[in-house]
Curated annotation (Swiss-Prot):
Cofactor names: Ca(2+); Zn(2+)
Compartments, record wording: Cell membrane
PANTHER family cross-referenced by the UniProt entry: MATRIX METALLOPROTEINASE, METALLOENDOPROTEINASE 1-MMP
Binding site for Zn(2+) 2: 130, 275, 279, 285
Name this polypeptide is given: Metalloendoproteinase 1-MMP
Residues of the propeptide: 29-149, 340-364
Native source organism of the sequence: Arabidopsis thaliana (Mouse-ear cress)
Modulation of this protein's activity: Inhibited by human TIMP-1 and TIMP-2 and by the peptide hydroxamate inhibitor (BB-94). Repressed by acetohydroxamic acid (AHA).
Gene name for this UniProt entry: 1MMP
Amino acid sequence: MSRNLIYRRNRALCFVLILFCFPYRFGARNTPEAEQSTAKATQIIHVSNSTWHDFSRLVDVQIGSHVSGVSELKRYLHRFGYVNDGSEIFSDVFDGPLESAISLYQENLGLPITGRLDTSTVTLMSLPRCGVSDTHMTINNDFLHTTAHYTYFNGKPKWNRDTLTYAISKTHKLDYLTSEDVKTVFRRAFSQWSSVIPVSFEEVDDFTTADLKIGFYAGDHGDGLPFDGVLGTLAHAFAPENGRLHLDAAETWIVDDDLKGSSEVAVDLESVATHEIGHLLGLGHSSQESAVMYPSLRPRTKKVDLTVDDVAGVLKLYGPNPKLRLDSLTQSEDSIKNGTVSHRFLSGNFIGYVLLVVGLILFL
């Protein structure tokens, strides 16, 4: 038997084994399981997002309707890449292009694809989120496409060196957070990614020469992506090798784990930092709600542990860290307690993890 044939046979066998060990990961998007996985999104959020229009009045609005607020919805979808209109002047008519945009939004956010403004869709649109567009991304289209939810920036840009320096701005900062607190948060966030890929991150003082530049900015800060106030877009970062990571200074950022006792509009800095570092590395948004790279994040929510989807996406770009530990891969067991999302190890599926890692390496 030829070496090439053996290789292809082993790839196929590995894929079958992964299917066997992770059957629930391979369902189509529009299934009862998918609807169950997004059930949390149907809970109307209690915190009003004053930055964006009150979309709640648009629930169940039908195509052909003329309703005040639809123009704001179109502007929102335009902001995140779903509506292409150079004039940026939108009507209040629920038309065909809007229905198509809603369907694409639902697909990208892991919702049942209906094209309708159901409660789960409208609620998700009201949540604070990352400012990076959901579209203009490259979808993973390899043999494992049916299992993957991660995306990349167009062209799949990546860094071509194994050590990246980063610096936190000493001028664009927050008065109520100490420099050391912010640095500690980012050290933890960077370590999440460096633990799974052969890239290390070195903190430096020189902001101008650092590969990755981090700072807090308010409003229009000159990069073409102005921030919009409390609980709108939380942050954004640029594809490699741009290196800029900007956080909205208008947010109430917290760096401890006292989420329950914090303000109703508090945002966990480490959760957002971990997400944005994924963008710095070249990852786009994931349609899997449990993933760190999912675009939306509820206030007072902590989500910092990389899921299998996050890890699979970044491994396809950089390959595995030689020191990658199997038990560092987390499979989400989303349990929302007191406003926090907890990600726990699946202790009962160790063999599945072994096969998954082997499969990822074979497909790299």
